Regions:
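Non-catalytic accessory regions of SAM-dependent methyltransferases
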Residues: 1-131, 138-141
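Glycine-rich nucleotide cofactor-binding entry segment
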Residues: 131-229
Length: 229
């Protein structure tokens, strides 16, 4: 498979399983990455980021779509709703993907999924959002940070507005994975070298000599150091 419609079709299926069927995002995504482990790292990273970002920003994405669509998100077909969500996420948050490519691939995917009659609708909504994305204004912090208002209100009441907003921002930052090294199998330096050889970003922590923070990897099971214990 090549990056483009094939990767986006994988993303669409993953998000349908998560957002429409209630699947746990880390489990569904992990299973998909394991199934498609023959894809190159760039494609898997594209899949991971788009899936995770779309799930995290669903509340905000729905607000944007509703602002530029004649049909509200809740009334859309699941495939179209999901296709728009993942595409709008790319338009708003993935600068390396040209908006024109996002729109074109979404139209192709709508057609491939037998929604030929809605190609114009998908194209119109996405291009309208693309043209106006710099003028987007958020009505409140719930939409701005894509956090349910009841949670945000509870945190503000408990911790104060400034701390609550800081907590929400922290949730939206790219996450790192903490792993404990099995120093009976290899030295910490050997484990770090193995990880770096697979182009994983590795950070040490002063909190524990046996713990490493990992980022910019596909999934743990794909790492040699993880597979070797």
């Amino acid at each position: 498979m090549t990056n483009g419609n094939s990767s986006r079709e994988i993303i669409l299926d993953i998000l349908l399983e998560i957002l429409e069927k209630g699947g746990y995002s880390h489990i569904v995504l992990g299973q998909a990455l394991s199934k498609y482990q023959y894809l190159d790292k760039q494609e898997r990273a594209f899949i991971s980021r788009t899936v995770e970002g779309t799930v995290e920003y669903t509340l905000q994405l729905d607000y944007v779509i509703n602002s530029y669509s004649s049909v509200k998100v809740k009334k859309m077909k699941p495939v179209i709703r999901t296709l728009l969500r993942m595409s709008v996420y790319q338009i708003l948050y993935m600068d390396r993907v040209p908006d024109s490519a996002v729109c074109n691939e979404a139209v192709k995917l709508a057609q491939k999924r037998k929604f030929t009659g809605l190609k114009g609708f998908v194209n119109g909504v996405l291009r309208n959002i693309s043209r106006n994305k710099e003028q987007l204004k958020w009505p409140d912090d719930s939409v701005r940070y894509s956090m349910p208002s009841w949670i945000l209100d509870m945190w503000k009441g408990t911790y104060g507005e400034e701390t609550a907003v800081s907590m929400v921002k922290a949730f939206l930052k790219p996450s790192r994975t903490a792993v404990r090294c099995n120093l009976n199998r290899a030295s910490k330096q050997e484990i770090m070298e193995s990880l770096k050889n697979q182009v994983v970003t590795v950070e040490e922590t002063p909190l524990s000599a046996a713990v490493l923070y990992l980022s910019k990897y596909d999934y743990l099971e794909s790492l040699d150091a993880f597979a070797e214990g």
